[in-house]
Amino acid sequence: MRLCICFVLLAVIVCASADNPFTRGGRFVLDAAGGAWDMLRAYRDMREANHIGADKYFHARGNYDAARRGPGGAWAARVISDARENWQGGVSGRGAEDTRADQEANAWGRNGGDPNRYRPPGLPSKY
């Protein structure tokens, strides 16, 4: 009986530590949820800062934070960024040039670039 229990425990430990599709899928979902939270946090900070010219910085920072979580976070950042730009492109009337610049900042952050490249002068250090 003890040998059987030991065997079952060993089997559970081996299966739990294995790189299986369920573990990877679960990690992807958790990364995506965390990435969505990172994007929301960057949006809230942008609204709170209310600083002229800071939108590109917050775009890059949200994508950067989300992508650092892993493939799920990078996927969430890409989906959210693309959806936001597609929606804003038709509603805000800011133009194609601004949308292109936003997408450049999104890609910069998502690819691991330092968001401070887009940091405007005078933005409080808390951001």
UniProtKB/Swiss-Prot annotation:
It comes from the Eukaryota. Induction: Upon cytokine stimulation. Residues 88-127 are annotated as: Disordered. Expressed by the liver; secreted in plasma. Also present in the liver and lung irrespective of induction. Keywords: Acute phase, Amyloid, HDL, Secreted, Signal. Residues 1-18 form the signal peptide. Its main location: secreted. GO terms for cellular component: high-density lipoprotein particle. This protein is the precursor of amyloid protein A, which is formed by the removal of approximately 3 residues from the C-terminal end. One of its GO terms (biological process) is acute-phase response. It is found in: Secreted. Major acute phase reactant. Apolipoprotein of the HDL complex. It is linked to Reactive, secondary amyloidosis is characterized by the extracellular accumulation in various tissues of the SAA protein. These deposits are highly insoluble and resistant to proteolysis; they disrupt tissue structure and compromise function. Belongs to the SAA family. This is Serum amyloid A protein. It comes from Anas platyrhynchos (Mallard). The lineage of its organism: Eukaryota, Metazoa, Chordata, Craniata, Vertebrata.
